[in-house]
Amino acid sequence: MKRLLLPLILLALPLMVYAENSTPRAEWVMTKPSDKNKAAAEFLKTGIYPATYGEASLSFIHKKRVAKSTLNDKGGAQAESVKGDYWLFEMPAENIPAGTVVDFWTQLNTSPTEENHRFALEYLDGKKWLPAMPLDKDGGNYTTTTSDKHPRRLWCAIRLSKEIKKGNIAFRLRQVEDKPLTVTVHNPSPRGQLNQMVCYKNVEARDTLKYLFIGNSYTYYHTYPMIFKEIAWHEGHYADCDIFISGGYTMKAHLSNKYSRAVVAEGGYDYAFLQDQSIQPLLNGTPDDSGITENMGKMIEQVRKYSPQAKPVIEITWGRKHGNNALGKYEYLLEKYPQFFTDYETMQARLIEVLTAEAEQFGTELSPVGIAWRIVRRERPDIELYWKDAHHQSYSGSYLAAAVAYQVIYRTPFGENAANAKLDAKTAAYLRSVAERVVLQGER
C-alpha cells in the first residue's frame, strides 16, 4: 500500500518522567500555508510529552494512487478512499506503561453525504491492530452520516495492554464498505478543538457515567468536554461522552438538525450538558425572543424522552470580554438593547439571571461557568480566559468550564493528584478552587 504522509513539526522537548498526574498528549494545530500552491499546509506540533523524538503525523494509506489528497485551511485532509484504505494517526511516545488509557478525538466528513458509511476504528497494541470498539458482522464498528456542513465526531478511549518503551501510539480508521468514498479528516486548528490524543494515568475507574454535550463553539474551542473527561479520570471516574456541536448553534437550530436529534435519540445518558448560543439568553422576553426558553424546554423534553434517567444541565456561559465586542450578526442589537451590552459585568449578570431562571423552570441542574468566570476576572485578571477574539474561551477558560462541570456532577473537592491538563500547576489549582467555591459553597 502507498502512504501519503502529511507531516507535522514536533517541537523539541526535554525528557520528562511519566508521573501520576502527567498527561502525554498530541494535538495538531494548523498554520496557513506559506505557499498556497503547495499541496500541503504547514503544521505546528505542540504539547507532546514525554516523547522526545520523531514527528506526530496524519497519513492516508491506500492501495492505489489517490485522485486528490490535500491539506488546506478550510476543509481538511482529503482523499478518495476504497475498501481497505485507512487514515493513520500516530503520536511518538516513550515509557508509556501497560494499562495506560488513551483518549482519541477527531472529526470527519464522508461523501456521498446523507448516507451511512462504515469504518473500523482500530488501535495498535504492541504489534497487533485491535478494534477500539467491538466489530459487527461486516467487520466495522463505526458508522458516519454527514452533510457538507456537519462533520461527524469520533471520540473513544482504549486501554493499552502493552508497554511502549519507544514507539508510537497509533489509531487508524479503515474503510470496510465497497463503495468508493471521499473522506475528509478535519484540519487541526489553532483553537485546539480537533485531532487529539491524550494519555491518562494507569488507574481503574471507580464508576462510569455517560454524558451528552449539546452546544456550539463555546463547547468545542479547546475541547472543554475532553478536559472534563481528563479531570474526571484523574479523580477516579470514567466519563463516557458523546457530543454534537456546531458553531453559532442555538437550541432552536439543534432541534431542527437531524444529526443533533439523532445523537439525543441514541439515549442512555446520565447527564446532558446543554449550551445555548451565547447571545440568545439576553433576548429572553424581548421582541427579538424567538422562543428561547421554549426551545430549551423542548430540548430538555427530548433528552428526558430518550434518557429517562438523565439529568439535564443548563450551562451559564460567559459574557463578551468587553460586553459589546465580537457580536457579528448580532451587532444590530447594540442599538435596540444597549442595556445588555454596557460592559462585561452587565452582560454576565443578564446571562446568569436568565439561565438560572430556565434551570428553575425546568427543574434541571445548572453549570455556573459564568459565575466562576466572573470571579476569576475580578480576582486574577492575569489569567486570560478568552481566546484572542475576546469572546471564545482560551485553554484556561475551557479548563475552568470543565472544572465547574466536574463539580456539578460529583460535588466533592478535587484530590491531591488532580489533572492540570496543559496548565501550570498553580493556575490549574486556582481555577479548580474557584469551581469548588462556586458549586460547593454557593459563592457568587
Predicted segment positions?
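Bacterial Sec-dependent N-terminal signal peptides
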Residues: 1-22
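Surface-exposed, low-complexity/disordered Ser/Thr/Gly/Pro/Asn-rich loops and linkers
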Residues: 49-98, 191-193
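Terminal, low-complexity interaction segments
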Residues: 30, 129, 138-203
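Extended, low-complexity, turn-rich repeat/linker tracts enriched in Gly/Pro/Ser/Thr and Asp/Glu
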Residues: 95-98, 108-117
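Alpha-helical cap/lid subdomain in secreted, periplasmic
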Residues: 263-391
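Conserved catalytic region of serine esterases and O-acyltransferases that act on ester linkages
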Residues: 207, 385, 389-396, 402-444
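Extracellular carbohydrate-recognition regions
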Residues: 19-53
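Conserved SGNH/GDSL esterase-like catalytic core that processes O-acyl groups on lipids
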Residues: 210-212, 218-302, 308
